[in-house]
Amino acid sequence: MASQLTQRGALFLLFFLTPAVTPTWYAGSGYYPDESYNEVYAEEVPQAPALDYRVPRWCYTLNIQDGEATCYSPKGGNYHSSLGTRCELSCDRGFRLIGRRSVQCLPSRRWSGTAYCRQMRCHALPFITSGTYTCTNGVLLDSRCDYSCSSGYHLEGDRSRICMEDGRWSGGEPVCVDIDPPKIRCPHSREKMAEPEKLTARVYWDPPLVKDSADGTITRVTLRGPEPGSHFPEGEHVIRYTAYDRAYNRASCKFIVKVQVRRCPTLKPPQHGYLTCTSAGDNYGATCEYHCDGGYDRQGTPSRVCQSSRQWSGSPPICAPMKINVNVNSAAGLLDQFYEKQRLLIISAPDPSNRYYKMQISMLQQSTCGLDLRHVTIIELVGQPPQEVGRIREQQLSANIIEELRQFQRLTRSYFNMVLIDKQGIDRDRYMEPVTPEEIFTFIDDYLLSNQELTQRREQRDICE
């Protein structure tokens, strides 16, 4: 009978507890689903200790070696480690606190942090050259180290240093220096002529002789100035050497390098021309070439060279007015004489009484200076055959040349027309009625002048005013 009751009780208990272990899973519950098992294990929650502010030693008693813990408890002065007690930590002199300066007794019976006292030390002082030091207490706080130098050396700087609370040594590191500076002797001063067509000369010399009277050691030698073998410009140049020994003594010496440039007298440009020169234009080896303005031909040597005797070779040429040969076989032969020398303004009119022609010639005759300044030559083609006239200045052109010029430049006899040709023989502008000289000059200045002409125009801006 008792056995039957026991079996019934077990079945009842199993039936009653079955819903409590149903394998239901919730996110973050601490349970994990597993399709291959139906059993689960409930996570046991540890029991939190009962908090009691009356327990005198809720946390262990604080003891900090080489330091002190000053505690304040809510329960009074006799409670130094009860729940809620706060302790301020500090170290003895010569020690540094590592960790928390303030901790509190927590409900977990632990302090809120840890700390300890580390003995303060300074770094080991480095040895000094030609000297030594002795210390009273090694590298510990308040240790004093006194410096001394070897015989023949003098101490410069702090004679003693003390290890301070911040872990640093007081003062600065001294040095032992010898009394005598090194001996140095520079090479002799020298003079050299510049090379042909150059304004510089390459100069060499031997290094200075240096010796130290103390231990014979020279740490470095510095040069103030160009290195040996450098190119020196014209003039005097001071070269200075400075030698340093191991004790930082120094000695200096200097010498002078003088470079001379052989120069010729300054050349003057020819009248109605200009010069282009190499190098500086007046130094030994320089070449100056003579050029003539448009409308002028050079007569004489084209260039001169500055010689070692400081004199120019040859004699200066002159720029003579350009001679135009109108007795040529073709218009091409006529135009070749102006190539790269002159610009041409060719005027064509049906007869000398043409109103446009007379107006244009009148304006140009009043602007001959501006035309010459811009290297412009006027060619006139006026009238009808057989009375047609062609002229350049006072020279008459043949009928064949007149006809070829008209065909080359497409100039009609039927009405007034005019063409401007540049120094390369290219048609640059055409006019069907008179234009002022200022309009022609502006066009030439803006579009046709070479760099050399632009320079001359800036120099001669007011020459025609």
UniProtKB/Swiss-Prot annotation:
Membrane spanning residue stretches: none
InterPro entries attached here? Answer: DUF4174, HYR_dom, SRPX-like, Sushi/SCR/CCP_sf, Sushi_SCR_CCP_dom
Q: Which GO terms describe its cellular component?
A: cell surface; collagen-containing extracellular matrix; cytoplasm; excitatory synapse; extracellular space; glutamatergic synapse; synaptic membrane
Domain Sushi: residue ranges: 69-119, 120-178, 262-321
Molecular-function GO term, any one: signaling receptor binding
Q: What is the tissue specificity?
A: Expressed in neurons of the rolandic area of the brain (at protein level). Highly expressed in the brain, placenta, lung, trachea, uterus, adrenal gland, heart, ovary and placenta. Weakly expressed in the peripheral blood, brain and bone marrow. Expressed in numerous cancer cell lines and in gastrointestinal cancer cells. Higher levels found in colorectal cancers than in normal colonic mucosa.
As for subcellular location, the record says: Secreted; Cytoplasm; Cell surface; Synapse
**What are the record keywords, sorted?**
Angiogenesis, Cell adhesion, Cytoplasm, Disease variant, Disulfide bond, Epilepsy, Glycoprotein, Intellectual disability, Proteoglycan, Repeat, Secreted, Signal, Sushi, Synapse
Disorder this protein is connected to according to its UniProt record: Rolandic epilepsy, impaired intellectual development, and speech dyspraxia, X-linked: A condition characterized by the association of rolandic seizures with oral and speech dyspraxia, and intellectual disability. Rolandic seizures occur during a period of significant brain maturation. During this time, dysfunction of neural network activities such as focal discharges may be associated with specific developmental disabilities resulting in specific cognitive impairments of language, visuo-spatial abilities or attention.
> Its quaternary structure?
Forms homooligomers. Interacts with PLAUR (via the UPAR/Ly6 domains), ADAMTS4 and CTSB. Interacts with HGF; the interaction increases the mitogenic activity of HGF.
- Name of the protein: Sushi repeat-containing protein SRPX2
Please give the organism.
Answer: Homo sapiens
